[in-house]
């Protein structure tokens, strides 16, 4: 297949390298020093077993419009980055192109091909103006849940931390020729990609962890095992999960594991920093609304109260605002320091910083 991976970051890099290695024609969309490194030396993946895999001739660009029509488009950017891509996405489509979104949280397409009274409902927290929903035909979409953990450790280099599960599901639950073909391609590349009859149930199972551990870790600067072993934060996680479970149940979703088992699974991961904590520490915009705000929205929609989720959401939104303000001040301070240093050394004290 011709495959385009939008966002060659940690997860995008993980799938791009192994799909290319298994014989598919893969193009990645990347930016900055990461793109420059991929163009120069290819995209390198270090798996959790220490083995190294490199796609030396990986096609890479920062312009979606140059990639051309694809058989499969893997959307491996954060939920809050999708809307900015919708104008250019159609340049990647031919009539049979499949779009495989890999976002965490409640996706924009959740109620598309859903059936029932909520068919076509727009999740405004993740798609405020319904631009994404209106731009992408739901018939193109196959759902996917991302379980692996990975990180970019240097430009052009992705380290896989753990996991290889990418469950797939048609939005209407059907087992089609196209989803079988994609699942087979993922399996041949070394991933575990079962075809699920209800991908939304799997989304909620993954979201249980993202909803709770991500914001709590960002607020406390703690790892998964820290949160799970501290009695108060473990109890908070349990209460947030119970609220989410009540919402999902109202939407017809049943969980195949208990809350205690889900927390125990997170505890076993150990000293792992969640992506939200990593974003906060790196000064990047954290992914909050798709993971937390969307659940509150669905709580309002279904009539389920979410007091614990509401409180954590308010705190982490303020944290985001505070970090953004601090980063702005830091950038201004850095510029002032640089200008002062340059004035001290240049004739006439003129500034060379713009």
Where are these regions (language model features)?
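Rossmann-like NAD(P)(H) cofactor-binding subdomain of soluble oxidoreductases
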Residues: 53-56, 61-153
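Generic preference for hydrophobic
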Residues: 28, 59-60, 168
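Short, hinge-like loop/turn segments at secondary-structure boundaries
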Residues: 44-47, 116-119, 158-162, 211-213, ...
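Internal alpha-helical scaffold of NAD(P)-dependent oxidoreductase catalytic cores
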Residues: 92, 133-206, 212, 218-256
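Nucleotide donor/acceptor-binding cores
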Residues: 1, 71, 164
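NAD(P)+-binding Rossmann beta1-loop-alpha1 motif at the extreme N-terminus of oxidoreductases
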Residues: 1-48, 352
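NAD(P)-dependent Rossmann-like dehydrogenase/reductase catalytic/cofactor-binding core
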Residues: 226, 234-354
């Amino acid at each position: 297949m011709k495959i385009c991976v939008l966002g060659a970051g940690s997860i995008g890099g993980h799938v791009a390298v192994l799909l290319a290695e298994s014989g598919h024609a893969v193009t990645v969309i990347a930016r900055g020093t990461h793109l420059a490194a991929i163009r120069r030396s290819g995209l390198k993946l270090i798996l959790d077993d220490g083995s190294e895999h490199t796609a030396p001739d990986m096609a890479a660009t920062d312009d979606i419009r140059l990639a051309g029509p694809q058989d499969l488009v893997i959307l491996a950017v954060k939920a809050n980055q999708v809307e900015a891509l919708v104008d250019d996405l159609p340049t990647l489509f031919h009539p049979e192109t499949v779009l495989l979104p890999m976002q965490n949280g409640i996706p924009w397409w959740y109620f598309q091909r859903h059936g029932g009274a909520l068919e076509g409902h727009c999740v405004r927290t993740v798609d405020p103006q319904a631009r994404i929903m209106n731009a992408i035909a739901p018939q193109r979409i196959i759902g996917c849940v991302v379980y692996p953990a990975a990180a970019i450790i240097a430009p052009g280099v992705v380290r896989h931390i753990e996991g290889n599960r990418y469950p797939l599901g048609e939005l209407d639950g059907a087992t089609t020729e196209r989803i079988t073909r994609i699942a087979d391609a993922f399996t041949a590349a070394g991933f575990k990609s079962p075809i699920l009859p209800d991908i939304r149930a799997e989304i909620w199972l993954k979201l249980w962890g993202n909803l709770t551990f991500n914001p709590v870790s960002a607020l406390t600067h703690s790892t998964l095992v820290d949160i799970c072993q501290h009695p108060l934060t473990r109890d908070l996680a349990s209460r947030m999960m119970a609220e989410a479970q009540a919402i999902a149940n109202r939407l017809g979703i049943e969980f195949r594991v208990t809350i205690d088992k889900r927390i125990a699974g997170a505890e076993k991961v150990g000293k792992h920093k969640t992506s939200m904590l990593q974003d906060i520490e790196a000064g990047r915009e954290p992914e909050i609304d798709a993971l937390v705000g969307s659940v509150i929205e669905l709580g309002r929609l279904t009539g389920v109260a979410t007091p614990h989720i509401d409180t954590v959401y308010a705190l982490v939104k303020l944290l985001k605002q505070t970090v953004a303000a601090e980063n702005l001040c830091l950038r201004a301070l850095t510029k002032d320091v640089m200008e002062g240093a340059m004035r001290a050394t240049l004739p006439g004290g003129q500034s060379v910083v713009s």
